[in-house]
Amino acid sequence: MSLDSIHHTIQAATNAFKEKLALHFDVSQTFLFGSMARHTEHAESDADVAVVLNGETGKFIDTKFAMDDLAYEVLLDTGVRIQPLPIWLNEWENPTGYPNPSLLFNIQREGLVL
């Protein structure tokens, strides 16, 4: 699947989210995954976005909450709910060391590069 196949509103929202992320985090890559990437979404679906971060592995909860705040700003601006998942580059490159390796393998297989 290609990014071109994503609905324009979702693409605009994920672009806005990426811009906000870049102001606060050292982002390596971002991926859309889940139902929107598979085109199985429904009216209440959110946009699952994996955010691969450079640098040392940080505190997941603190990072997740900070990204959630940015996603909320995007929700207010666009009406699109983004659910960010922070992943550090060393976890991305070595999924077996991640608490849920199958999730990372799934994102690597089905995710759309944003």
Description of each model-found segment:
Residues 1-28, 37-43, 54-114:
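Catalytic core of pol beta-like nucleotidyltransferases
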